[in-house]
Amino acid sequence: MSERIEIPAEKLHEEMLKLRQGKHMDFLRSLTGMDWGEEGLGVVYHLEDTNTRENIVVSTRTTNREKPELPSVSDIWKGAEFNEREVYDYYGIRFIGHPDMRRLFLRDDWVGYPLRKDYDESLNPLRMTNEEPVDTTQYIEVQHDGSVIEKRETIFDEDEYIINIGPQHPATHGVLRFRVSLEGEIIKKLDVHCGYIHRGIEKMCESLTYPQTLALTDRLDYLGAHQNRHALCMCIEQAMGVEVSERVRSEEHTS
């Protein structure tokens, strides 16, 4: 059983640094955005000590739904950079100190944040035009007086040689595109664009019954259909308090 901790937003970065250094939580397994309704918007972090396999689950939240902000942990775990961008994309939570607070999957002109419970789908009719490329990153910083400012930096300079790799390239399987800056055959910079075949499965599941969602989990990854369905079934069984047979438990441990 994982240890569970709730940390106030104002102490999050300090306490997460203690977990990383003091308890050797060197692996951020996942970082998930949450909408708890009246209790606020927040994030759940799953941390692991790769030596002992000890796990800690950390949660934090903000009650400010109009302008939700939380400290970034991307300077503690590098892998948090894309996870925090995903949370911003779907929940609108901005992470203070994150080096690149752009959307990750959705268009930059998307209105609203689709995984919020109060999201209005009518705000985004089907667009038949291409989105304009964004060549600047957004950095959010807290000043000494407590005020929050936004800084922008240019991704590529005017004299850089830029090429696209994907989404049609065989190596990217149609799911993402890279913009790369080249110096000869050396890649100097790489800008990742995801979400080309994103289908909003998580949002669709909110309005379906448990049995109806099983077919959708199979489609998340055509190379991992069984694992995704299996994980969802285990989650549903645990939430409902269902006791499965010994045979099923044995298969869970071997799959």
Residue ranges and their predicted role:
Residues 1-186:
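Terminal low-complexity/charged segments
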